[in-house]
Curated annotation (Swiss-Prot):
Gene name in the database record: Bnipl
Protein known as: Bcl-2/adenovirus E1B 19 kDa-interacting protein 2-like protein
Protein function: May be a bridge molecule between BCL2 and ARHGAP1/CDC42 in promoting cell death.
Biased composition (Acidic residues): 92-105
Subunit relationships: Homodimer. Interacts with BCL2, ARHGAP1, MIF and GFER.
Gene Ontology biological-process annotations: apoptotic process
């Protein structure tokens, strides 16, 4: 009885599914049931394996026709070939997913190769280094008013600087080489080159001078940097207003504020120290701890090399007056 039930179930399976196939409409009417009943479980399993073309009507082979190019040329392929082709297509899809990520890593690595050349660019001025290191981030254009304009492009930002109006004050910022290992740039800020507050268009000049300094800093600074403020020879009329300093600090990019290792102030006068005390509430405590005061150029020479540092003559003269020949 059990064998008969098994045979009936096998006959039901053999009779039911082939009816769905249009190419085998006469299979249920064949008078070969006694022969099938005489076969044991092994022939029935073989018969089921032999009827594998009925699975070709499943959606898997047809999907492979639309998703891949190489699996749908023969629509009557057996399920083993369909399953192997689908597995192969899955392997190919995984490779395709990994390939873009590998290429993106290679592309992202090439974006920073130019920074490896920064330490070799020694002895450059601020504007020359910006043009040489910017790699297309800086361009000079002539305006309709006859002024020469410099355009700084950093990321998605664009700053236009009136170079004609700030030409006498460009020396306020200069590049002093590199300190230690790596890309630790030395940036000099000589306040003796700042304009006096009594000149015409003072606000306009200071605004474009600030744009010039920020644009040059973003091009020169690759990693950490040391900012040296040469405050010697600066009159009170040349000290910028508090609002300008506060605007500079707030507008300064976070990367430049974070990568600043130290702010070294040389020959700080009493009003410069008082000015820094007034600015302290507007700056962070971390930035305040980075400020360091030096009394002479000799102390500065112990901190950094002065071979590539451009020191104004008025600062050198002040240092000689204060400390004699041993100061430098």
């Amino acid at each position: 009885m059990k064998l008969g039930e098994l045979e009936l179930r096998e006959e039901w399976q053999d009779e039911e599914f082939p009816r769905l196939l249009p190419e085998e409409p006469g299979s249920p009417g064949d008078p070969e049931d006694p022969q099938r009943g005489s076969q044991a479980g092994t022939p029935s399993s073989l018969a089921l394996c032999g009827q594998r073309p009925m699975r070709k009507r499943l959606s898997a082979p047809e999907w492979q026709l639309s998703l891949t190019e190489g699996t749908g040329e023969n629509g009557a392929s057996p399920t083993r070939s369909a399953s192997s082709s689908s597995a192969g297509s899955l392997d190919l899809e995984v490779d395709e997913l990994e390939t873009p990520s590998d290429s993106e890593q290679l592309d992202s690595g090439h974006e920073f190769e130019w920074e490896d050349d920064l330490p070799r660019a020694e002895g450059l001025g601020a504007s020359e280094a910006a043009e040489r290191l910017g790699r297309g981030c800086v361009c000079d254009v002539a305006g309709e008013d006859g002024h020469r304009w410099r355009v700084f492009r950093t990321g998605q930002r664009e700053q236009r600087v009136d170079m004609t109006i700030i030409e006498p004050y460009k020396k306020v910022l200069s590049h002093g080489g590199y300190h230690g290992d790596g890309l630790n740039a030395v940036i000099l800020f000589a306040s003796c080159y700042l304009p006096r507050s009594s000149i015409p268009n003072y606000t306009y000049i200071m605004e474009h001078l600030f744009r010039y300094m920020v644009g040059t800093l973003e091009l020169l600074v690759a990693e950490n940097y040391l900012l040296v403020h040469l405050s010697g020879g600066t009159s009170r009329a040349q000290v910028p207003p508090l609002s300008w300093i506060r605007q500079c600090y707030r507008t300064l990019d976070r990367r430049l504020r974070k990568n600043l290792r130290a702010l070294v102030v040389v020959h700080a006068t009493w009003y410069v120290k008082a000015f820094l005390a007034l600015v302290r509430p507007f700056i962070s405590s971390k930035f305040t701890r980075k400020i360091r005061f030096l009394d002479s150029l000799g102390e500065l020479a112990q901190l950094i090399s002065l071979e590539q540092v451009h020191i104004p003559e008025v600062v050198r003269q002040l240092d000689r007056d204060l400390h004699g020949s041993k100061g430098t």
